[in-house]
Amino acid sequence: IYVGMEHSIGDTSFPLRLIRAQFPKLAVPPIGQPCYDSENRLVGIVLGVSRKGTCHLLPARAISFLATHPEAKRVRLGCLLDINSSTPVIEGLINGGPLARGGIQTGDILININDTPIRNYGDMLDATYYLTGDKPLSIEVIRGTQVVTSKGILPTQDPR
């Protein structure tokens, strides 16, 4: 049974939102097991299981992305967002980092990455997870009462 999406558990943050599913204790799938919906579509693969029957799944979209982009690097923007905030306000920037070089400022509200709407921290995680890192980014923020767009930002790349 689908419960929700989570970007962290306790002090552990994930590189993207994982699907949280609850199963009856006797029907908990093992780690590595694919899970399907009622229409037999892949939902994800089980990454972890708790004693209470809660599972975390790697979403099918992530599996597909990694299969089609095996060389993709992990993209980093060089910014800090409050993981618990309902608004994606840029709390800090790494000096000389991608967003700082693109003119983004502390206090800006992140609203789009390459035309993907950003409403919260989880949206930002997912948007950056599915980037390949080989193309410049377009970032849109709200600064005061203005919408500001910065194009041509080259992200930092790390191995996945």
List the predicted regions and their residue ranges.
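Active-site region of chymotrypsin-like
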Residues: 1-49, 75, 83, 87-92
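Conserved PDZ fold ligand-binding element
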Residues: 35-44, 99-122
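C-terminal cap/linker of serine protease catalytic domains
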Residues: 38-86, 126, 144, 158-160
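A generic structural motif
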Residues: 49, 116, 124, 154-155
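PDZ domains, with a preference for the canonical peptide-binding region formed by the helix
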Residues: 112-140
